[in-house]
């Protein structure tokens, strides 16, 4: 009221439901709010599980005019599965003002036609120029020039991203006649140590390169030069990796959760029209699930190159992330 917002409408967007701002009710008094005890009610800010605490995210849901998350599928997940981290009841009570709006990309940054960080720019109609970027990627990472697909992972290395499947994907790629590149780091010391060990183990392998850390220019080159990216997330509110991959004509191989379901449509099993099918999907959390998708993707690249080229075209034409 003091800053003239008493009559304004409020839209509250939530990306991660895990961090809810659960704290003691003393915060309400410290904030100088009038009649704070009125807010400490089950239908307002009182946490649904710890009745001695307030839940600031719950309060945001209750008092906002509209609440969004970053994909339609994730909106369903947080209402009806444990991905709501205890807020499912509140979201269901307020479901008329809650929905998912798909995330998008900044096309001033992620756009193959104007990307200054890749050696050769290209568009939907000249995807064959990806091969020039693939050659540049191999040259930079000291991979050998062979008739092999390049499979990549770009992103954080942690449990949410399916780190056990990322590791398995590396081994599967090399065992199936593909090359594998990784760009990522982990906030977890044990995971970070594990991937440094893998990096040293594969240091002299001409079909594998692991870059621990983050390099913006290399990230762009990987998206432009790789044939496929893997994204075996355990949960994914939206995901940007698959959106970038699609824009760059790079086929995503994803686990069917959250925003990945809203953006990636399996080439073989989706009920979408064929021209809208743009990648591969699996649902299990084990290695066999990832295998089932990777074997189809690698097999298409190896044995049906024209069909794979058409899939890349469909990926680049995907109407997502806008």
What do these predicted regions represent?
Residues 1-322:
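Catalytic cores of nucleotide-sugar-dependent glycosyltransferases that transfer UDP/GDP/TDP-activated
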């Amino acid at each position: 009221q003091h800053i003239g917002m008493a009559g304004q409408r409020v839209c509250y967007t939530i990306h991660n439901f895990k961090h809810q701002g659960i704290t003691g009710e003393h915060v309400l008094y410290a904030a100088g709010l009038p009649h704070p005890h009125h807010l400490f009610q089950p239908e307002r800010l009182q946490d649904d599980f710890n009745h001695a605490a307030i839940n600031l995210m719950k309060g945001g849901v209750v008092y906002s005019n509209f609440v969004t998350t970053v994909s339609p599928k994730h909106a369903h997940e947080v209402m009806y599965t444990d991905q709501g981290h205890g807020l499912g009841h509140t979201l269901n009570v307020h479901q008329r003002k809650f929905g998912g709006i798909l995330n998008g990309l900044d096309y001033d940054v992620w756009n193959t036609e104007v990307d200054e960080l890749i050696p050769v720019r290209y568009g939907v109609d000249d995807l064959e120029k990806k091969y020039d970027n693939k050659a540049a990627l191999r040259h930079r990472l000291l991979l050998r020039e062979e008739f092999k697909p390049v499979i990549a992972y770009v992103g954080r290395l942690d449990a949410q991203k399916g780190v056990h499947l990322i590791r398995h994907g590396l081994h599967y790629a090399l065992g199936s006649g593909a090359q594998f590149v990784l760009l990522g780091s982990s906030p977890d010391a044990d995971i970070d140590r594990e991937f440094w060990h893998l990096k040293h183990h594969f240091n002299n392998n001409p079909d594998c390169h692991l870059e621990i850390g983050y390099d913006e220019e290399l990230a762009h080159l990987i998206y432009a030069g790789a044939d496929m990216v893997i994204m075996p997330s355990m949960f994914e509110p939206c995901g940007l990796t698959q959106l970038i991959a699609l824009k760059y004509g790079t086929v995503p191989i994803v686990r069917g959760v959250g925003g990945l379901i809203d953006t990636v449509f399996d080439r073989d099993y989706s009920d979408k029209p064929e021209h809208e099918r743009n990648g591969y999907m699996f649902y299990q959390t084990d290695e066999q699930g990832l295998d089932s998708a990777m074997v189809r993707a690698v097999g298409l690249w190896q044995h049906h190159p024209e069909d794979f080229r058409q899939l890349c075209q469909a990926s680049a034409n995907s109407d997502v992330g806008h």
